[in-house]
Amino acid sequence: MTTIEKLNAPWEPPQLPSEIPHGDMPGDHISIYPDHVRKAETLFRALRPMLASQLSQSAHGRVVISVCGGSGAGKTGIASVLAYFLRAMGIGTYLLSGDNYPRRIPQDNDQERIRVFRVAGLRGLLAEDQYTPERMAELRKAWEAENDADPQQAVERPWMKTYQQAGRKALAQYLGTPGETDFDEVNQLLASFKQGQNLVYLKRMGRQFDELWYDPVDMTGIEVLLLEWTHGNSEYLFGVDLPILLNSTPAQTLAHRMARNRDGKIDSPFVAMVLDIEQQKLDHQAHKAKLILSREGELLDYVSYRGLSIDTSERGTR
């Protein structure tokens, strides 16, 4: 039976073992919960005919699928289950983590995000002729307290609003862009895979400065490259055939990050701003997704997704 015939045949989800393989991000420890399995089953039933169609059109019989969403959406767990389903059908699948491709390790990137925000904020004050040494002294105190991104700081100080707006604008121009992430390297990797190249070198990036290397990976027999990544539906990313979007909210993302607590300071006003910008970018890119899954595990069309996003945004501002 060919791969396309397998995908078009009746399917029942296999029983998962206690542990299944996950992505290639160094140091990741993944727990698979029943909710991941349930959502993956829903997605897989809709994905199978789409994947069969894409494979039939592929010159080298290779397809790239991405699973994207905020960090609380269950990307890694759901992508791991999808990969297991494909392998159980005898379809060669490699699960790739996009988190290997930022330009800086997490700690350094967090510092760069803050630098971008603060430099732009100061320049915004200068541009509006609102900068004074006294206000700079107040800002230094806010920097030490790490609350200069807190909207409450601007309630009685209009100049702080100028600072925050200018900083947020610059931050939005950095987050999820080629300045932060090496999209060119990922794009080249996807192109090489789809063109039939078997030996590829995949980047590995840990959380320390010297945790950086490349692993040779043999893609012989791999028909599906499954990319698990927040930016898997980005306008800077090329070569994804079937992007899947998992819906989440900034509040869920924050709760997920607090549960992991890998880098500290994750419930700060600045992190809240980062997550809000991230969600806006995901919403902006959502129209390109081939499948959208709600937080409750239901498939959505784009119009329904936008309705949920707008409702969530309005409730968040009340």
Question: PLM features: residue spans?
Answer:
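Conserved lysine of the Walker
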Residues: K75
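Hydrophobic anchor at the beta1->P-loop junction of P-loop NTPases
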Residues: I65-V67
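Hydrophobic positions on the alpha1 helix immediately C-terminal to the Walker A/P-loop
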Residues: I78, L82
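Walker A (P-loop) phosphate-binding loop of P-loop NTPases
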Residues: G72
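NTP-dependent small-molecule kinase module
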Residues: T2-S58, L242-L245, A255-D263, Q279-R318
